[in-house]
Design a protein with these regions (language model features):
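Hydrophobic faces of well-ordered beta-strands that scaffold small-molecule active sites
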Residues: 59-61, 80-82, 104-108, 133-134, ...
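Short, acidic/polar
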Residues: 63-73, 117-121, 160-168, 207-210
Length: 232
């Protein structure tokens, strides 16, 4: 095992052992993302900061490599979804995002070296400056809320069972539901109405028209890995 691999293993052992705005007709429209503001439901106040940021700019930069990281740091986005990294490098990725004055939310399920267990959320909380997590697992979201982090439940709408998962999120009470793919305005509207929770969406959205359709259907914000969407 090389030096990097040894360092990663040591990090894991040390931790585990002890326990918006949208352009419309050439004009920028503040608050166009969502009709009405959300108010925090207790906790650290991070939730309200996220909602306020997405009211100002409803486009979220989703990054999946270092090239995306470099581009998002220069983009006029206030919120970043981190979709890559490992236990050795995630703190550095988050640090750069935070130093740029942006909100950093890590997709905990995608970080190499982390399991989909509650202790992985503790790891991110204790070793990085991440504001919150995304996960498809209810136990991960629940732990994030216990640690006063932002918790976003991601749901892939591939069948009726997935839709039931989205509807049941009202009992889990995440800060938002992130549904993919994003080209389903009817589902966005329905999930928001039934759960009463903020809805984020993304995936396959590449044009301004698609962004506007999702926002008009009631989405709070749109996430995208495409830098051209970040500039809309």
């Amino acid at each position: 095992m090389g030096t990097s691999g040894q360092s990663c293993r040591l990090v894991a052992m040390l931790f585990l052992c002890p326990f918006g705005q949208i352009h419309q007709g050439g004009h920028r429209v503040p608050g166009a993302a969502y009709p009405g503001k959300f108010r925090k439901r207790g906790g650290s106040g991070l939730e309200q900061r996220l909602y306020d940021a997405l009211q100002r700019n409803p486009i979220i930069a989703a990054i999946r490599d270092d090239a995306g990281l470099e581009k998002c740091l220069q983009a006029d986005v206030q919120t970043v979804f981190v979709l890559y990294g490992d236990i050795c490098g995630i703190a550095g990725i988050v640090e750069r995002i935070k130093n740029a004055g942006k909100i950093a939310i890590v997709h905990a399920d995608l970080i190499v070296g982390l399991a989909t267990k509650e202790i992985s959320v503790d790891f991110l909380h204790n070793t990085t400056r991440a504001d919150g997590i995304i996960s498809t697992r209810a136990n991960m979201i629940q732990r994030a809320k216990e640690l006063q982090m932002i918790g976003i439940l991601r749901v892939f709408l591939i069948d009726s069972m997935a839709l039931d998962t989205a509807f049941s999120a009202r009992n889990l009470k995440p800060d938002a539901i992130d549904i993919l793919p994003g080209l389903m305005p009817t589902m966005i509207r329905k999930i928001r109405q039934i759960t009463g929770l903020p809805v984020l969406t993304g995936g396959l959205i590449t044009e301004k028209r698609e962004v506007m359709q999702a926002l008009e259907a009631g989405a709070l914000a749109i996430s995208s890995t495409a830098p051209n969407v970040w500039q809309m």
